[in-house]
Amino acid sequence: MPAAPGLTRVLTRYADGRSELSLDPDLRVFVADLVRPYGLPLREDLLAEGVGHAYEELAAGLLAEALGPDEPADVLIQAFDSPDIRPGAPTSLALSRSCAGTPTALALCDQGTAGAFAALRAALAYQRTGVARRAVVVLAEQTALHHRPPEPVTLPDRHCAVVLVCETLPGEELTVRQESGAAVGPDDSVGSVGSVGSVESVAEEVRRQAKALGEDAAVLLAAGLEVPGLDAVRVPAGQPFTGLWSALAERLPGWRAERRPVLLADFDPRLGVLSTLTLRAGPPS
């Protein structure tokens, strides 16, 4: 049976408290430079108090747990929506030193909840070209925003990191799709379709993909995504970026043991992007 990119491990970790980097005076300089062109005020109270968590501290130990010293990564992609509190060098580069190998390090941000799926698509693309045998995606969110946003934003209740390891597996079938007024096919081709922005069309597309997986499919829906008539696990609110993936980390071992195909779905209404992941396991080992 031919091998294909698959999802071998998903780990999650929550953290409380703060990083000492939240009191670094350079953080104020960094945030002030970022918001100055937009005229946004700083949260001087949070900067003085010291709140938030650095993503390197949050994810480094989880990376070491996910990958052993004899499991080098070829590509590491970090995705986040709420900003890191560590000014200076990109966190993805720092995290690349927390796992075996010398992976190409990339970061992806400002894509809402669609960013996690986009990072996985990029990882799978690297694998399909043969550039990467093992690709790692690191998702992270922390609770502090050190400036006032121009419009209301949803911040997480807790600091959280998720690590997803993608490797080549016999018979595995992992597909990530993203739609926003255009359909992205399994081969990443783009074709014109009707808008997926309405509640009805989003729900219908999720139902269609679930039906294609069969009656025994396990369906995991992100917080806020309603699909009437579909038997699914619904992720509670509170972790807008990592919640869906933390739930996958908790449930995937059981679903794999039951040989069930899996569908994850999330809709970012601000961007109008429907993102889905389907996973069919290979033959029993």
Predicted regions and their residues:
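Short beta-strand segments
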Residues: 79, 136-141, 264-268
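A glycine- and small-aliphatic-rich helix-loop capping segment at beta-alpha/alpha-beta transitions
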Residues: 90-102, 126, 153, 280-284
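Short, well-ordered amphipathic alpha-helical segments that serve as non-catalytic structural scaffolds
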Residues: 51-69, 198-213, 244-247, 251
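Internal, hydrophobic cores of structured domains that mediate oligomerization or house catalytic pockets
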Residues: 97-101, 105-146, 150
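Claisen-condensing/thiolase-fold acyl-transfer catalytic domains that form or cleave C-C bonds
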Residues: 110-128, 217-285
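Conserved beta-ketoacyl condensing-enzyme motif
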Residues: 53-100, 214-226
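Secondary-structure boundary elements
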Residues: 67-71, 125-134, 168-171
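Condensing-enzyme catalytic core mediating Claisen C-C bond formation in acyl metabolism
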Residues: 1-52, 149-215, 275-285
